[in-house]
C-alpha cells in the first residue's frame, strides 16, 4: 500500500487507473468531485458499474473528459466481504470471473488490457450493455431482501444473506432471471443464468 489519503487531488494525480468502489448512488457525486483532477490518458473503473457509463456520460462530456480519459465498467465488485466488528471487515471470498468493458467499447482492446493486469479475473465483454445484462447483484439482492425485509432489518441479529435465502426469494430470483435472459438475448448479449454465473464467479 503506497498511500492512504482523503485528498482527492493527491489520490488521483500520477495514477494510471482510478477505481470507483462505492455504491451506485454515489458514482455521480464522487466522479464530479474527482473530475477536476483527472488528466490525459487516465482510466476510471466503476465497480460495481450499474450502468455507470450511461448515467455519467453527460457529465463526462460536460467536463470535457470524453477525449481525455477512458471509462470502464465492471459487472461486479471483486470481493465478497462483510463487516465483522467496529472498523473491521473481512474478505470471505473473491470472484474468479468478472465481466468488464470500456465505454465506449472501441477502447476495449487497449484499455481493458490494463485493468486485467491488476485483476486477471476480469473477462472482456463486447460492450457495457452486455456487462450490465450479465448476472450480478441485481439478479438476487432485491429478490432476497424484499420477502424477508422485516426479519432482516427488525428482528435478525445476524442474517446470512445468501445461505439463508427463502424459497420465495429463490422463485423471485428465477423469475427475474428469465426476464433478464430474454432482454439480453434480444440485444444479442452473451449471458447465462444466475446460478451458472455464481459457479463461474466463485468456482463452487
Q: In which residue ranges do the predicted regions lie?
A:
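Conserved N-terminal Rossmann-fold NAD(P) cofactor-binding segment
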Residues: 1-14, 55
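Rossmann-like NAD(P)(H) cofactor-binding subdomain of soluble oxidoreductases
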Residues: 24-85
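Small-residue-rich helix-loop
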Residues: 177-204
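Residues at the C-termini of beta-strands that transition into short coil/loop
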Residues: 8, 48, 75, 104, ...
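N-terminal Rossmann-like NAD(P) cofactor-binding module of classical short-chain dehydrogenase/reductase
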Residues: 16-19
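Substrate/ligand-engaging "lid" and interaction regions
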Residues: 78-176
Amino acid at each position: 500500500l503506497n498511500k492512504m489519503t482523503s485528498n482527492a487531488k493527491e489520490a488521483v494525480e500520477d495514477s494510471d487507473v482510478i477505481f470507483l468502489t462505492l455504491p451506485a448512488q454515489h458514482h455521480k457525486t464522487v466522479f464530479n468531485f474527482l473530475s477536476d483532477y483527472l488528466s490525459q490518458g487516465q482510466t476510471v473503473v466503476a465497480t460495481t458499474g450499474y450502468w455507470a457509463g450511461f448515467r455519467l456520460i453527460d457529465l463526462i462530456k460536460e467536463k470535457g473528459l470524453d477525449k481525455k480519459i477512458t471509462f470502464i465498467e465492471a459487472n461486479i465488485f471483486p470481493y465478497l466481504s462483510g463487516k465483522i466488528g467496529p472498523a473491521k471487515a473481512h474478505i470471505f471470498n473473491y470472484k474468479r470471473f468478472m465481466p468488464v468493458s470500456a465505454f465506449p467499447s472501441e477502447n476495449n482492446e487497449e484499455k481493458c488490457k490494463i485493468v486485467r493486469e491488476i485483476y486477471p479475473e476480469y473477462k472482456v465483454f463486447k460492450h457495457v450493455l452486455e456487462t450490465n445484462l450479465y448476472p450480478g447483484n441485481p439478479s438476487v439482492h432485491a429478490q432476497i431482501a424484499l420477502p424477508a425485509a422485516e426479519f432482516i432489518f427488525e428482528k435478525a441479529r445476524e442474517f446470512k444473506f445468501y445461505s439463508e435465502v427463502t424459497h420465495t426469494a429463490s422463485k423471485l430470483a428465477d423469475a427475474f432471471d428469465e426476464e433478464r435472459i430474454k432482454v439480453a438475448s434480444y440485444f444479442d448479449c452473451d449471458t447465462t443464468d444466475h446460478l451458472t454465473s455464481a459457479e463461474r464467479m466463485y468456482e463452487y
